[in-house]
From Swiss-Prot:
Family: Belongs to the PetL family.
Organism phylogeny: Eukaryota, Viridiplantae, Streptophyta, Embryophyta, Tracheophyta
Superkingdom of source: Eukaryota
Record protein name field: Cytochrome b6-f complex subunit 6
GO cellular component assignments: chloroplast thylakoid membrane; cytochrome b6f complex
Annotated organism of origin: Pelargonium hortorum
Record HAMAP family: Cytb6_f_PetL
Protein location: Plastid, Chloroplast thylakoid membrane
Alphabetically ordered keywords of this record: Chloroplast, Electron transport, Membrane, Photosynthesis, Plastid, Thylakoid, Transmembrane, Transmembrane helix, Transport
Entry GO MF terms: electron transporter, transferring electrons within cytochrome b6/f complex of photosystem II activity
Membrane-spanning intervals of the chain: 4-24
Membrane-topology annotation of the record: Single-pass membrane protein
Length: 31
């Protein structure tokens, strides 16, 4: 159970970082 929770937590963090970088690149590209 702990491995599944940590896996989903890591997936959520990776998704957040990816979306944050994507938004940052989009803003830079927009300017």
């Amino acid at each position: 159970m702990l491995t599944i929770t940590s896996y989903f937590g890591f997936l959520l963090v990776a998704l957040t970082i990816t979306s944050a970088l994507f938004i940052g690149l989009s803003k830079i590209r927009l300017i």
